[in-house]
């Protein structure tokens, strides 16, 4: 039972829509004390469907934990040496990522945008689109999601994945294909190769040896 509750919790946490969340949370309620605890914590603190704002699919603090791991030995050094190690690390990361962005040949970042969008292009091929009006379209997904509503004026889909990720979901992709609209135009600029390059365009310079420092006389 414990493993099942963990599975339902993970599915509930990652659900995009309230309806999908409720489906999994009802199963968690079989353990009343677990459901009560999760409700007291606040659904918006752990549920994607209830969260405020957009987290772009990020659900953990792995970035902070990864940096702590990289600096685990440097953290034992004096503060000046620790700062030097952090700067050297940033120099290395910025250089490597700028090179990756320069060599990128796709419109979107390969792993976080392009790969997802291409998979959704394949999924969209089996969907039927019905025009409701000039802005809204019903999309029939015969595989999983049933009928969903896409609104291009508000850049929204009733599955909510488009709004939260800022990347076209498979239903929006299907509508773009139906209208012969470039699907890449619906992706947030934060996924683009240009933004990736701009993010790492500046240079970070390592600290020079102490003997080369230009220290003002009044310091």
Enumerate the predicted regions with their spans:
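Hydrophobic, aromatic-enriched, well-ordered structural segments
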Residues: 1-219
């Amino acid at each position: 039972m414990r493993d099942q509750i963990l599975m339902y919790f993970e599915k509930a946490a990652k659900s995009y829509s309230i309806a999908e969340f409720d489906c999994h949370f009802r199963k968690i309620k079989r353990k009343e004390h677990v459901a009560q605890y999760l409700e007291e914590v606040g659904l918006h603190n752990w549920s994607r469907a209830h969260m405020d704002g957009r987290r772009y699919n990020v659900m953990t603090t792995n970035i902070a934990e990864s940096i702590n791991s990289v600096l685990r030995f440097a953290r034992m050094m004096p503060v000046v040496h620790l700062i030097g190690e952090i700067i050297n690390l940033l120099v290395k990361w910025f250089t490597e990522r700028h090179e990756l962005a320069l060599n990128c040949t796709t419109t979107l970042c390969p792993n976080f945008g392009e790969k997802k969008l291409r998979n959704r292009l394949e999924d969209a091929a089996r969907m039927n689109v019905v025009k409701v009006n000039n802005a809204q379209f019903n999309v029939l997904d015969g595989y999983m999601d049933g009928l969903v509503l896409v609104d291009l004026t508000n850049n929204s889909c009733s599955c909510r994945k488009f709004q939260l990720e800022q990347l076209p979901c498979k239903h929006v992709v299907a509508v773009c294909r139906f209208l012969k609209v470039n699907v890449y135009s619906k992706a947030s600029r934060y996924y683009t190769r240009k933004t990736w390059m701009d993010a790492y365009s500046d240079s970070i310079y390592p600290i020079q040896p102490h003997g080369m420092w230009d220290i003002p006389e009044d310091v």
